[in-house]
Amino acid sequence: MEQQKKNIKRYTEEEIEKAASLDIVDYCMQNDIPVKPDSERYYRLTEHDSLIIDRKKNQFYWNSRGVNGNIIKFVQEVEDASFPGAMQRLLDGEQDYEKASEITFVSEPYDYEHFEQKEVSRFDRAREYLIEERKIDPQVVDALHNKGLIKQDKYNNVLFLWKDRETGAVMGGSEQGVVKSDKYKRGAWKSIQKNSTANYGFNVLNGEPRNLKFYESDIDLLSYATLHKHNLKDTHLISMEGLKPQVIFNYYMKACERIGDVPDSLSLCVDNDKAGKAFVERLIHFRYEKNDGSIVAFKPEYPQAPSEEKKWDWNDECKRVAKQQEQREQGRRAAYLQQRGMER
């Protein structure tokens, strides 16, 4: 007994504070504890819906058991861990949990009218950028512009409007500059409009949302649509504007409500890189049962990276395919001209 006591690690106040600062919802996401959002702030466990998580306070309340507390207490209660066991799991060096203090909440509602004033009727610069620079299919660009999903502002930025597919309301927006400059970290202006509604993103619905596909960016979404435009029946394409599981679960719940069943497929069309693969690992263990008893799980759908590339996204793939097509066309044109010359 004395030896067991000696083997129990004692944690410092700093370590306890560090553990307590970690976000409960992110811990759940990374450890296959299914949660569902009631709102931006409140979540509940799927298997114990009387357990509510207040993400803003980073506290949980298990109403049926009369238990509440911070993330350390959460791990003890939900995973039946001792205090040292909970601390060990939270401070595991292989996991990188978000800090609760870094989770942002919208304090003011999104005001589309404010941003709408910057929109212009012309679409020339935005269209040219998407087609010539990003190699997006002109038919895809024009179709989405005609639907009011992609526009141009007075600064010539491309505007991606985040529309709610049920109400038609604009929930937020993202902006992509068309001029390269060294003063921008990513080479060009890129921004999410202020107070854009949490858990939404740029999205395109073709038919019913029976197949959900999630992307890291608006451009990746358009690139995928370019490469697979003939195979998108009953498909909802959604940009997470990064790697955000909250966006995924929001649109998953909306799809279930609309079709009255679990979607037929859930695809994570993320970058083929370390971060994208780590994100997939967080979600592939979730299982959902359809009305007919079949099981649906998240599946990765990476762009095929060349062997020498450590990072490859869907726009990289779109550009690669476009270049191959251009080279084939040049080859055919050269062969045709050569043949004409021989005939003369």
Curated annotation (Swiss-Prot):
Q: Where is the composition biased (Basic and acidic residues)?
A: 323-332
Region named Disordered: 323-344
A biological process (GO) of this protein is:
DNA replication
What keywords appear on the UniProt entry?
Answer: Plasmid
One GO MF annotation is: zinc ion binding
Q: Which cysteines are joined by disulfide bonds?
A: none
Q: Does the keyword Thylakoid apply?
A: no
* Designated name of the protein: Uncharacterized protein pXO2-78/BXB0107/GBAA_pXO2_0107
